[in-house]
């Protein structure tokens, strides 16, 4: 049955921005990675870990954020998540050492991912069938474009600022999402909310972990994304330290590579019968 709710331009833009926060948080500061070890008196491996630990936070946040929104509605978890994401981003910008930065990056991923998973839930509140597919395709497009645009923006920011300013930009982006969360009208009425959503969700997670088919497919995804994130975390060091490219030149190379990934995804979908 098709949803009767009207999808406004605000909802479309808001959901797109919610979806963009995690790829922006991952890719915006990539051009700055090689200059960060010296400033924080640490090594490249620990700086690269700031990407991995944020990704871990994203994974945990999505496991919790979805059930929370099913139990308490979409609006409250969004507001709380975006407030905490603003704080985490500011903490990243003022981190005095690598230890504080790692903690802040984990919190940034944890809180930012709440908006990502709730954006998908809101999509289902407003649409179904083909309309839902079109809306989800739009959100996937945002997810695809963000890795192309983010390093380009980050590289240009480094022309007149430091890597710390990049996290201020992320804090500002989260603040915009926070304002949108206050404007957003709750899409899940109380009568449709699930009591004990978190406990039910974790029981379902336990069932999934016993499913061999699920585990097998998850391992395939794990290895695929493991290689992808190895490239993300190491590419800026290789391009800038070995090939002597500037931060801006690296961002162009990374953007071209991301375009290739998007093209491959499109061709892959068209090849499926």
Task: Walk through the language-model features, giving the residues of each.
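Extracytoplasmic
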Residues: 10-44, 65, 231-236
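Flexible cytoplasmic inter-helical loops of multi-pass small-molecule transporters
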Residues: 182-206
